[in-house]
Amino acid sequence: MLSKTRILNLFLGILIALSLELFSGTTTFAQNIETIKISGTAAGISTRYIGAVEGNINFDIKDLQDLGINTYRIYGGMSRWEAEDDDGKYGWPSIDEIKTNPNIINWAHWDRIMTDPPQGSDYWWSGQPGTVWQGNARTIFNTLKQANIRPVVSIRNVDSGWKPSWALQLNPPRTGEDWNEWWEHVFATVYWLNVRNDYRVDDWEIHNEPDNRDQGWGGTRADYFELVKVAKDAIDFVYKTYLPDRTYRIHGPKTVGGSNWPEAALQEIPNYFDTVNVHNYDADISNYTRKVRGWMNGTVRANSQLWVGEWGTYEISYGDLSLALNLIKNVIRGSQPGDNYIDGSHIFCLYDWGKLGLAEGLVGEGGKRRAGYYALRMGIRALQGGKATFFPITNSSDLMAVATIDASKNVYLLVVNDRATSYTVNADISELIKTGNGTVREFSSQRMDEVVGNLRLKGGNASFALAGNSAILIKFDRQN
């Protein structure tokens, strides 16, 4: 039998052990507390347009609307809409003849290719039958118009597959006949979409990554600048002659990430485009964004919009959680003020491209939505549309956060944790809102932008758990 002394000592030992365990746990927990105090001074506004580049396996407006995008980028050009010379006579009609009488163009060809494309698909040029979406260009553009989603169309003579073969002779254009064909194609595209029809397509890109030979441009930088000048003349003629009350935008120079072509374009042809548009696949897009902004400063494009026409990935699956979280961080970076700011963007790409070896999109075969889709959707909820932005007074080294206010004065708080460590976050948004109920959404390996609970503000403060490798979005409804 144990003596009373031994029993007492054993009991005390157990108490000490329990106390140490509890203390240890509490100490560890305390180390994982982060306090975020949001400034009451607006830093600026969030990115106005967040959209996606098309993919060829599908086009379903329900995906675009559920994702919340308000712009959609489309690869136009000769391979898609003029795979054969539309009139069969190279170099005819001339630019002056078209300006005098636009009906000299073979509009029967354009009506047919836009309405009854080969193999029943506007993507016939990019994939095998049975692997691409079934539908025509009319459906795409009319659907975007009805949904108030802003299309941005790239016009190319030759695509990344160096097609169509007949257009190789004007890649780059050299002769008068070459320039006639290029001018006619640009004119016909813009005229068909906006004059012959009314699809409200007012954003135009001239080629795609002209500094990347794999994308089909066969000329030099100087040749590309001439291509832009002639395209500008064709586009400008359509609007001044037939759409005098409409504003159009030419995006340029549409170059690869890290390229120095934008600097040259801003010096040599700044009056032939009005929206600076570059590609940027960096993990942190802000570094190159700042460089391009620096080039814009001191030119006539200093106050012009800056768009990122492609970002995200074409190498890694959008099912990757780390990549998905970084999408949210880059959306936040694009809404930061000053030289980090991005006016509009298109992630590459919404849908898979059906050709073997090409990129995965946010949405795969059978409508499967990947993690990146839900991550971007969360970022769009908080940031798209030019909302007033507010950032932490002191930035956390571990978390990235931003708050926004929408037109109804509701407040959004978005916090991203791309580390394995979990946190308790004490958020102070008292400078923006004092009381209100918050709906909490979580993005993580377990929750894909799903509602997980509610919070009530107390004096503008709220606490919540933030799991490792996750993001939280809280929408606080303004009480009347």
Language-model-detected regions and their locations in the chain:
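Carbohydrate-binding surface patches
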Residues: 395-436, 469-473
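C-terminal beta-strand-rich structural cap/linker in extracellular carbohydrate-active enzymes
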Residues: 455-480
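Catalytic-core region of carbohydrate-active enzymes that cleave or remodel glycosidic bonds
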Residues: 275, 280-355, 365-381, 418-420, ...
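Bacterial N-terminal signal peptides that target proteins for export
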Residues: 1-14
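Solvent-exposed beta-hairpin/edge-strand motifs
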Residues: 430-448
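Bacterial N-terminal signal peptides
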Residues: 11-24
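Substrate-binding cleft and catalytic face of glycoside hydrolase catalytic domains
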Residues: 70-284
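Mature N-terminal, pre-catalytic/accessory segment of carbohydrate-active enzymes
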Residues: 17, 28-59
